[in-house]
């Protein structure tokens, strides 16, 4: 775990030198095919040598729910264990990790008409977030005000069931049937992380991110309300292609949104239980050594 641009993927790949592990991606953006540059997906070479499960499993026009992730990731974990190997989950989607660790309550299925209404209301600035804050302040504190997919789902659950997401979660008796070790890479300071994020976005644009989004834009079956196109970077570039902002605005808004995401990820990690926090280092082998030291102290054997 860890905020964006902290080297999670490189560390996971490095750990394969020392441990018999199989990698599982825990990232709500990396699931989409054809969205490689803007999601900072591992290179073709890295994926060939170090396959990641739950990566490139959906077309951008498709939705992917937290319930689907829970089912898929538990299946992948079970398959890896049956192979006699260790599942290693890597990514920055903190909500997905939370679902894996604590489960989901039995929730009402989505209602098309209600969802369409809430999507329309999402165009009103902060409407969804303010509404959820009144209904379910605990859930609102855990969901970013621009995370429309989760805000809509939380409101949808309340309107359909009459109970808040927080209330329903209290009735959840789910327990993960595995012994787990949790690690998070922590950046040295805010300024360092902000600089890393800006450098990543500049590199992304140099690698042809605009062309990648243009290909999606010209398909004709995608729109900006889809979860895939709401991914950071894609949403801003999409608006640029619609002539709704300048190239400079697109660049600055992408940096701003990515920094907010990193802040949100660190907020999750601040209160995360039973986690081993590892200070960032530019050399993956040094980070791997820190992970191995923790495992050794806990009598972990391969």
UniProtKB/Swiss-Prot annotation:
EC number: 2.5.1.75
InterPro entries cross-referenced by the UniProt entry: Dimethylallyltransferase (IPR039657), IPT (IPR018022), P-loop_NTPase (IPR027417)
Catalytic activity: adenosine(37) in tRNA + dimethylallyl diphosphate = N(6)-dimethylallyladenosine(37) in tRNA + diphosphate
Binding site for substrate: 4-9
Recorded superkingdom: Bacteria
Chain positions recorded as ATP binding sites: 2-9
Top-level enzyme category: transferase
Cofactor(s) needed for function: Mg(2+)
Residues carrying the site annotation Interaction with substrate tRNA: 93, 115
A Pfam family per the record: IPPT
Region (Interaction with substrate tRNA): 27-30, 149-153
Keywords in alphabetical order: ATP-binding, Magnesium, Nucleotide-binding, Transferase, tRNA processing
Gene Ontology biological process terms from the UniProt entry: tRNA modification
Gene Ontology terms for molecular function: ATP binding; tRNA dimethylallyltransferase activity
Assembly notes: Monomer.
Annotated family: Belongs to the IPP transferase family.
NCBIfam families: miaA (TIGR00174)
Job of this protein: Catalyzes the transfer of a dimethylallyl group onto the adenine at position 37 in tRNAs that read codons beginning with uridine, leading to the formation of N6-(dimethylallyl)adenosine (i(6)A).
Protein name: tRNA dimethylallyltransferase
């Amino acid at each position: 775990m860890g905020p964006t641009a902290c080297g999670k993927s490189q560390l996971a790949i490095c750990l394969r030198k020392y441990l018999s592990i199989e990698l599982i991606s825990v990232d709500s953006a990396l699931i989409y095919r054809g969205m490689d540059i803007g999601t900072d997906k591992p290179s073709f070479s890295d994926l060939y040598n170090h396959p990641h499960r739950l990566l490139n499993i959906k077309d951008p026009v498709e939705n992917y729910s937290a319930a689907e992730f829970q089912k898929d990731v538990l299946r992948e974990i079970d398959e890896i264990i049956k192979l006699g190997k260790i599942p290693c989950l890597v990514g920055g989607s903190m909500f997905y990790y939370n679902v894996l660790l604590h489960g989901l309550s039995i929730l009402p299925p989505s209602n098309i008409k209600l969802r369409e209404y809430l999507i329309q209301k999402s165009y009103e600035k902060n409407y969804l977030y303010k509404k959820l804050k009144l209904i379910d302040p605990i859930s609102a504190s855990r969901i970013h005000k621009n995370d429309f997919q989760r805000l809509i789902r939380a409101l949808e659950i309340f309107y359909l069931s009459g109970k808040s997401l927080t209330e329903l979660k209290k009735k959840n008796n789910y327990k993960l049937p595995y012994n787990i070790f949790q690690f998070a890479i922590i950046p040295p300071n805010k300024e360092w992380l902000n600089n890393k994020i800006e450098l990543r976005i500049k590199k992304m644009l140099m690698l042809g991110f605009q062309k990648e989004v243009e290909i999606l834009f010209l398909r004709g079956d995608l729109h900006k309300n889809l979860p895939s196109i709401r991914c950071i970077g894609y949403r801003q570039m999409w608006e640029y292609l619609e002539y709704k902002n300048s190239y400079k605005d697109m660049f600055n808004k992408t940096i701003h949104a990515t920094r907010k995401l990193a802040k949100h990820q660190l907020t999750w990690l601040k209160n995360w239980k039973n986690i081993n926090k590892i200070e960032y280092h530019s050399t993956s082998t040094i980070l791997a050594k820190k992970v191995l030291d923790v495992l050794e102290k806990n009598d972990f054997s391969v």
